[in-house]
Amino acid sequence: MAFNLKNRHLLSLAHHSTEEIKFLVGLAADLKEAKYCGTEQPLLKGKNIALIFEKASTRTRCAFEVAAHDQGAHVTYLGPSGSHIGHKESMKDTARVLGRMYDGIEYRGFHQSVVEELAEYAGVPVFNGLTDEFHPTQMLADALTMREHAEKPFHEIKFAYVGDGRNNMGRSLLLLGAKLGMDVRIGAPEGLQPEAELVERCREWAEQSGGKVLVTASAEEAVRDVDFIHTDVWVSMGEPVESWSERVGTLLPFQINDALVKAAGNPRVKVMHCLPAFHNSETAVGAEVAKTYPELANGIEVTESVFESPACIAFDQAENRMHTIKAVLVSSLA
């Protein structure tokens, strides 16, 4: 099937076909190899990219900046306190200003509607670096990471996400698996599962791609026979601290610990996390939670023993953010 990614937005993978997603992952693998071999060619010379961050970031910002620099592009970082966006100037007006100056715009913030408004009015490609609803650049990195470690085609890969299924990772992984014909399972408490409308759409995509979709309230059922187990933090950026009290009791059965890894029944199973991870009490947040919940001192959504084991490939994921973001920029702007 013919397709053209030139000047395309990346708002969520819902707007990309199976073939387009596979192409981006393949291009990322090629660009990664070229960087490792020292043969990378800068294809974005003379391009300028604006990076709008309404949420703090380590991996996304670094990945976009390094990817752009490697390809010869220039970036301007607009942080939460460094512009008039949303305070003195609407996103619609901001889009029309930046679109006159930049060849592409990245946005990391809260509402999906904001990045979609940005795309509607900017007149240049817009890339979603994360919203509360979707995290498409992370999905491309996860797809590349799973392909590297599984050493088999996507349609033979089984993976599970356990935790809060309503957040951007749970929702995005469900979409990714359905689009790529994978066997995807979401293990989450009934009150924290993806909304029925999204599940139904993903089941339709899975039917077209040959994939499988399972949403279950049993972590053990979700991870049975999988190749990969994904998780994310239990309280996301922007949510009140009080959320911990209601989440801990509900989500503790979905913690990735030695017992849950064993329940997969696959000695080669890998554990994935988009980071940052609360796998001990060495962070300010981890220490604060451990004061109230001592049983979580050695990890919240994933335990220290699992995170520091050979099964955990979270840092391969982190590196692949840069390679896959580079693929998005090259495919759209080169």
UniProtKB/Swiss-Prot annotation:
Principal subcellular localisation of the protein: cytoplasm
Compartments where located: Cytoplasm
Keyword Plastid: no
GO biological process: arginine biosynthetic process via ornithine; citrulline biosynthetic process; L-arginine biosynthetic process
Gene3D superfamilies per record: Aspartate/ornithine carbamoyltransferase
Pathway: Amino-acid biosynthesis; L-arginine biosynthesis; L-arginine from L-ornithine and carbamoyl phosphate: step 1/3
GO CC, any one term: cytoplasm
Residues at which carbamoyl phosphate binds: S57, T58, R59, T60, R108, H135, P136, T137, Q138, C274, L275, R321
UniProt keyword terms in alphabetical order: Amino-acid biosynthesis, Arginine biosynthesis, Cytoplasm, Transferase
MF-aspect GO terms: amino acid binding; ornithine carbamoyltransferase activity
Binding residues annotated for L-ornithine, in chain numbering: N168, D232, S236, M237
Pfam families recorded: OTCace, OTCace_N
SUPFAM superfamilies: Aspartate/ornithine carbamoyltransferase
InterPro entries recorded: Asp/Orn_carbamoyltranf_P-bd, Asp/Orn_carbamoylTrfase, Asp/Orn_carbamoylTrfase_sf, Asp_carbamoyltransf_Asp/Orn-bd, Orn/put_carbamltrans, OTCase_ArgI
Protein purpose: Reversibly catalyzes the transfer of the carbamoyl group from carbamoyl phosphate (CP) to the N(epsilon) atom of ornithine (ORN) to produce L-citrulline.
Protein name: Ornithine carbamoyltransferase
Organism whose genome encodes this protein: Cutibacterium acnes (strain DSM 16379 / KPA171202)
Lineage: Bacteria, Bacillati, Actinomycetota, Actinomycetes, Propionibacteriales
